[in-house]
Amino acid sequence: MMKMSKEYSTISKIYGPLMIVEGVKGVAYGEVVEIETESGEKRKGQVLDARENMAIVQVFEGTRDLDIKTTSVRFTGETLKVPVSMDMLGRIFNGIGKPIDGGPEIIPEDRRDVHGAPLNPVARAYPRDFIQTGISAIDGMNTLVRGQKLPIFSGSGLPHNQLAAQIARQAKVLGEEESFAVVFAAMGITYEEANFFKKSFEETGAIERAVLFLNLADDPAIERIITPRMALTVAEYLAFDYDMHVLVILTDMTNYCEALREISAAREEVPGRRGYPGYMYTDLATIYERAGRIRGRKGSITQMPILTMPDDDITHPIPDLTGYITEGQIVLSRELHRKGIYPPIDVLPSLSRLMKDGIGKGKTREDHPQLAQQLYAAYAEGRSLRDLVAVVGEEALSETDKKYLEFADRFEREFVAQGYYEDRSIEETLDLGWELLSILPESELKRVKKEMIMKYHPKYRKRSS
């Protein structure tokens, strides 16, 4: 039953993105507010805090040019809802869901609460199916699984935007009968970055199966709190109403957390670590936990949030708390970036906790689990020997040690590195892994069973063919 709307002109204070309305009754937390100026301009807001006879309202379009005396506030009695429709595929919206691509307004099939419906943990299905991104360092070493939440930890100046666009363009589920979509939400990005994403999606045709939400750096910070929730609400609609497999890419979650800190400071809340609000963990969980699968439903939501680590500090509160909630991380390396390697994914600190359940026979290939373990071990050994060479010189190494050094160099140049438009199948990725392992003596392949070596090692594969 819809509550009656109430209008007030009793604004007592405006500061930052917030306004305080006095003398209100029956106002609820999260309620949508319509703000009207003397000139008739309308803006939207949401109740952040409701107390006896007083409400704190956050204004989505910002409070600039609002006058306390001539501005009226109407409490609608509804929570914030986003209009959803299959017609949203192929469209670009701003951070609060208004079309910015010159196309018509969306005629909604339904309106959904941006906070989503709580998902009973018992109703969740365990993620088990492989998603192919076409990027070897992810598919081969840190596999993405349907329903997983796998963040990318980046740093300022690293090519995470290019990586996000490449994943959005190339990601697919194997099997023609499966329908796949990408929901892309960018928060606090520059005009240059927004144009890059628009151009990348439109020129490659990826826009046809995508929904884009773009919140710009000069948009009000408060919009950044809404943007990822808008995107996830649309993703839930596509996944659970239309049985689609949806990949949600959120960038940059650091900008989201900065907006959270800004609003918390405006509300004069007691700060937590480094000034971020104490409830940031819970707030991030309300976003990340909307990934997953539901028993009895075909659709799924897979999340790849991207965040830039301030000062490349992986112990910073944002990556630290994100790591607690999500199921692994893809870490970008400044050292690899300096070497000219794209994408600069450092596979050693990277991890996909659900990888073991999404690979192997019937999913990728039977040799995948053992091959990945052997590649990890060999690359780790090569990296360790690099440090040793810096101390004792290469002359002190054995022939086998030199092979490991060669392997580490070629692994970075040939396996990790690939072109921006290079889309490798999982078979190509695994075969490339075996080619690199052939550098090492067969006696060093201790993590791969003999029958796998006989079947997939290039030396034996060429003989059988």
Curated annotation (Swiss-Prot):
GO biological process, one term: proton motive force-driven plasma membrane ATP synthesis
Domain of life of the source: Archaea
GO molecular function: ATP binding; proton-transporting ATP synthase activity, rotational mechanism
Cross-referenced Pfam families: ATP-synt_ab, ATP-synt_ab_N, ATP-synt_VA_C
Keywords from the named record: ATP synthesis, Cell membrane, Hydrogen ion transport, Ion transport, Membrane, Transport
Principal localisation: membrane
SUPFAM superfamilies: C-terminal domain of alpha and beta subunits of F1 ATP synthase, P-loop containing nucleoside triphosphate hydrolases
GO cellular component annotations of the record: plasma membrane; proton-transporting two-sector ATPase complex, catalytic domain
InterPro entries in alphabetical order: ATP-synt_VA_C, ATPase_a/bsu_AS, ATPase_A1-cplx_bsu, ATPase_F1/V1/A1_a/bsu_N, ATPase_F1/V1/A1_a/bsu_nucl-bd, P-loop_NTPase, V-ATPase_su_B/beta
Record's subcellular location: Cell membrane
Membrane topology qualifier: Peripheral membrane protein
Matching PROSITE patterns: ATPASE_ALPHA_BETA
The protein's role, per its UniProt record: Component of the A-type ATP synthase that produces ATP from ADP in the presence of a proton gradient across the membrane. The B chain is a regulatory subunit.
Quaternary state and interactors: Has multiple subunits with at least A(3), B(3), C, D, E, F, H, I and proteolipid K(x).
HAMAP family per the UniProt record, alphabetical: ATP_synth_B_arch (MF_00310)
Entry similarity comment: Belongs to the ATPase alpha/beta chains family.
Record's protein name: A-type ATP synthase subunit B
Organism: Pyrococcus horikoshii (strain ATCC 700860 / DSM 12428 / JCM 9974 / NBRC 100139 / OT-3)
Biological classification of the source: Archaea, Methanobacteriati, Methanobacteriota, Thermococci, Thermococcales
